[in-house]
Amino acid sequence: MSFQVRRDRSDDRSHRFNHQQTWIPRNSSTSSVVVNEPLLPPNTDRNSETLDAGSASRPVYLQRQHNASGPPSYNHHQRSSNIGPPPPNQHRRYNAPDNQHQRSDNIGPPQPNQHRRYNAPDNQHQRSDNSGPPQPYRHRRNNAPENQHQRSDNIGPPPPNRQRRNNASGTLPDNRQRVASRTRPVNQGKRVAKEENVVLTDPNLPQLVQELQEKLVKSSIECMICYDKVGRSANIWSCSSCYSIFHINCIKRWARAPTSVDLLAEKNQGDNWRCPGCQSVQLTSSKEISYRCFCGKRRDPPSDPYLTPHSCGEPCGKPLEKEFAPAETTEEDLCPHVCVLQCHPGPCPPCKAFAPPRSCPCGKKMVTTRCSERRSDLVCGQRCDKLLSCGRHQCERTCHVGPCDPCQVLVNATCFCKKKVETVICGDMNVKGELKAEDGVYSCSFNCGKPLGCGNHFCSEVCHPGPCGDCDLLPSRVKTCYCGNTRLEEQIRQSCLDPIPSCSNVCRKLLPCRLHTCNEMCHAGDCPPCLVQVNQKCRCGSTSRAVECYITTSSEAEKFVCAKPCGRKKNCGRHRCSERCCPLLNGKKNDLSGDWDPHVCQIPCQKKLRCGQHSCESLCHSGHCPPCLEMIFTDLTCACGRTSIPPPLSCGTPVPSCQLPCPIPQPCGHSDTHGCHFGDCPPCSTPVEKKCVGGHVVLRNIPCGLKDIRCTKICGKTRRCGMHACARTCHPEPCDSFNESEAGMRVTCRQKCGAPRTDCRHTCAALCHPSAPCPDLRCEFSVTITCSCGRITATVPCDAGGRSANGSNVYCAAYDEASVLQKLPAPLQPVESSGNRIPLGQRKLSCDDECAKLERKRVLQDAFDITPPNLEALHFSENSAMTEIISDLYRRDPKWVLAVEERCKFLVLGKARGSTSALKVHIFCPMQKDKRDTVRLIAERWKLGVSNAGWEPKRFTVVHVTAKSKPPTRIIGARGGAISIGGPHPPFYDSLVDMDPGLVVSFLDLPREANISALVLRFGGECELVWLNDKNALAVFHDHARAATAMRRLEHGSVYHGAVVVQSGGQSPSLNNVWGKLPGSSAWDVDKGNPWRRAVIQESDDSWGAEDSPIGGSSTDAQASALRSAKSNSPIVTSVNRWSVLEPKKASTSTLEPIAQIEESSSSKTTGKQPVEGSGEEVVDDWEKVCE
């Protein structure tokens, strides 16, 4: 929406030059504004070239017209191309219909009949391009004064009838008052223009200029350095090459950076820096960078909301011909005009002015073109007719640029010696200009043969132009003998036919070798060859020989070549030179003759090009092969053929990427879930229910195309022996590999037999023997025997069984019984001789004196009712000093010692919590040295890693689990010193024992490229950094706030989880175990948020397995130990009575009993999940959990 600044006009003509209404474009999305600007003097020079230079680059302005009888209309006016304000006669009236006025390109004073009236009908006035006098217009009045003038582009003084007098009262005319009263406010106009979505663009402006102006108005341009938006009021710098816009502070920092310097330009031109956008070299220093408008005329331009941001509003004035024009361009070829647009970003438009008339290349016609087209080929289309270089014929081509072609006219010409006549091309002859009949024009390459001036001899030169010259044997030219050492007297020779006398001296002429002289007597003719013996080297310089000198210098002489091969690598770097006596053996390229280079590999490359179809046809070379130059002239389609690229295409062009679904139907019948592709279709990914290969469980959400699904359960199928179950994890059938000849036979499975022995409670240790009874051998299972009081113990073989085959009392022993008896700590108690042999495992040891003393002490304790402290549990090693330190502190502070022992127990036996790292660590609070030593001793019993950190008095101890960590033989404070299998009670945080978890930040499983130097630099004096190993570290702070800050700011930091649980307000201690998991809770409760991590059926396990046992279990330590021993040593069965598996009825019934028990127990744990009816499989949702 535009608003008008109206004022009264004075009758005085000089007053009209003080102010004038000019148009200033705001942006592409808003309307124009009429403001007052001072006018140029009347004599301002405006030439026609400047006028036309900006005619094609005018912005189009939109003005809203208000009519009383209808909605507002729009009126498009074109901007004047004059530089500066227009003359006073170029005032415009508003409320004119569309396309009413067209521009006039007449140059000169305006004609009287060229006044334009407003409120005229559409297309009334058209642009006049006539060179003669203009035709009179038909004036139409529409409630307008008689002397209302239209805009004219004529240059010159205004006519006198173009004056407007002000009203006497100083007010506007009635019609103008009505227009002004109907003018809308600015904000309302903007809102209406926005609602109507009016887009104002000028096709004559470069697209980059329009885009930059629009982005600057919307503040959507990003600085390439800081990636921040460039605002209207920000100081900027614009590159003159790529027109990128940067913040002034950002570009100054870039210019000061060492990486922005162009090293080549720095050597030649001094200080410089490169533009971040186009890398063009800027030959200014960072201190000289300043904020200027786009045309560079005004420094620190003010922010005007009606102008393009960062524009000064003045004419651009940049030369339309860049100073980096081609080198061959002369000053006359450069454009003399400047840009007349308002100060703008981006490139200036091409010049639209007319250049001075120029002649065509042939010079017959003068051509007038635009200034921007002055370097184009200006041909007139007529025949050239220029004289060719031969000087005899004219050019017959059409008017052309550049030199004329050589003359191709055929002429009959004779040679210089007049022996031969040929038809030659005129342009190939050396003789230029007119030809005379007696002159030859070319050489026939034969001897001339013309008689010389003496008349006695003939010319021996090759056919040549001009006279032949004088005879060389004339007395006037021969002054000496043949060798030149003796001068001849004039009276000796009278004519050229007289012989030349020779002297008696040695010739001494320099031979062709240029090293020796002729030793013959003065003679006629050429000197004989040089016979001096010289040393000649071969081409490679490794061998030499003695030969006559003329052999080394004669052009036809034999080349001396040795037999030594070169062996150096050729230019390809792959093959070696096999040339014998190679001149490049010693790296001397000067010895090469002609273009021959023996180290240029002549083997074809023949490598496969990147296209994969063609081979490299170049010679063997180093580096990458050039791209394939073959072309494809057929459509390049995808696999389904629905997406293609039309030819021509370069060989090796990848197939188009097709986003359509694959048309091949899935064999399973599900819908396609993958895109177009080459080759076989991927497996179907639709989730379905599937059984594992062993038939143990039904897995849900399994991809349909996934094959060979295995769970983690034991196979349990009966093997071919009929006695044992397969102990492998879930696998496809069969469990045993066998030959066809063994079909139907019971074959050993190579497992231990496991049948109960008849002589003892142990099982048969022999390999499976389905077709034979168990061998009657002595039992070799290790058992423990004791004395009567139980103090002395020893481990011996069971020794039961082992009768001979004939039933006699002769036993077969598989070991040396005497050596076992010698190692016993005490002798065996005697037995009665009843004739039956008592196995060694069923006998007892004899008590000694120490046993008697302990028995007496026990009797006294029972008599006096004395209960001594359980210090026996501390005697767990041979280190008496360590035992005394712990025992002493245990007597003084048993609660503290038990607390430390409990935390070590949780580190070794508990499960990690709160982190994906397998490392378990605990930090004790700062304490005195004697307690730190006790912590170290207790941790060493559990084989834990121990380290101390910090300074006194805040030095603390850190313990963590290692690969060697394991429970000790006895635990301090436990009854009998045994380790319970049940889950331990989680200890709670104690400020007298444990470090506050809020002060610790963990850095666990650090990647190799991780760098925590930021922690050292920022929090170096506020924390202690403790390295547990090369990938795990802890940071212990002194303040909670700084620890929380480090947790937020530092990478790879995580929450510290020790061996204690911080008790929250009102929460029962039994809700969490030591690692933060509910005892007895299933994976369904923990991972109920993720449907892929659910398991319907859970199996209880001890603390060493996948699940924690309930705290406070009723099973004793002995029962738990026996249970763990049974899990590791007992054979796997498939029925309740494994010895009756061969009976069909019993086997089928008993086999389903354990599975039924599993289903019954699982039904009480699941949340509404029911097993599949009529099958013995378990149904689970988490197939990943099962396959782990």
Curated annotation (Swiss-Prot):
Zinc finger intervals, RING-type: 223-279
> In the UniProt record, does the keyword Manganese occur?
no
Q: What is its EC number?
A: 2.3.2.-
Q: Where are the zinc fingers (NF-X1-type)?
A: 335-353, 390-409, 454-473, 513-532, 572-607, 611-630, 668-686, 721-751, 760-781
Induction behaviour: By brassinosteroids, osmotic stress and high salinity.
Stretches assigned to the R3H domain: 894-963
Give the protein's biological function.
Mediates E2-dependent ubiquitination. Confers resistance to osmotic stress such as high salinity. Promotes H(2)O(2) production. Negative regulator of some defense-related genes via an salicylic acid (SA)-dependent signaling pathway. Confers susceptibility to the compatible phytopathogen Pseudomonas syringae pv. tomato strain DC3000 (Pst DC3000). Mediates resistance to type A trichothecenes (phytotoxins produced by phytopathogenic fungi).
Protein name, entry field: NF-X1-type zinc finger protein NFXL1
Q: Which gene encodes it?
A: NFXL1
